[in-house]
């Protein structure tokens, strides 16, 4: 073999060794489990209120995205409203059609929260918005729970995306 080829092979082995060594040192993923430290979106309902009107139930939700990546917003394409005897699922197209107003928080300067037919509620990391929905059905008096379903989250996270309200 030529001298240049031998030096190239030795250099390549050293580079691969350096990459594997720093990967093991920093992340422990050469020998051991592969670790993914990416954040999972977490939507929180900070306020909920509802009242009956002639058209059905008027629902007011303050939703914030308090954890997750800032490269793309968190979404909740499914919302469940339930109590001990009854439940309904609102899918993204229902959420989009029933939303009559979105009030942005004052600190939402550049990116705005919104709804659409595909993603349902769309909330930017660190922002908060009030979503006002006119539901086309009446809720009987009682205590209800709302749960927002975010794609790819565990049941522990879903438990945190729940709020309670009362219709009197």
UniProtKB/Swiss-Prot annotation:
One of its GO terms (molecular function) is thiosulfate dehydrogenase (quinone) activity. Keywords: Cell membrane, Electron transport, Glycoprotein, Membrane, Oxidoreductase, Quinone, Respiratory chain, Transmembrane, Transmembrane helix, Transport. The chain crosses the membrane at residues 6-26. Optimum pH is around 5, pH range of activity is different in tested buffers. It is a single-pass membrane protein. It catalyses: 6-decylubiquinone + 2 thiosulfate = 6-decylubiquinol + tetrathionate. The N-terminus is blocked. It is found in: Cell membrane. Heterodimer of a large and a small subunit in a 2:2 stoichiometry. TQO may associate with the terminal oxidase formed by doxBCE. NCBIfam families: TQO_small_DoxA. This is Thiosulfate dehydrogenase [quinone] small subunit. It comes from Acidianus ambivalens (Desulfurolobus ambivalens). The lineage of its organism: Archaea, Thermoproteota, Thermoprotei, Sulfolobales, Sulfolobaceae. The gene is doxA.
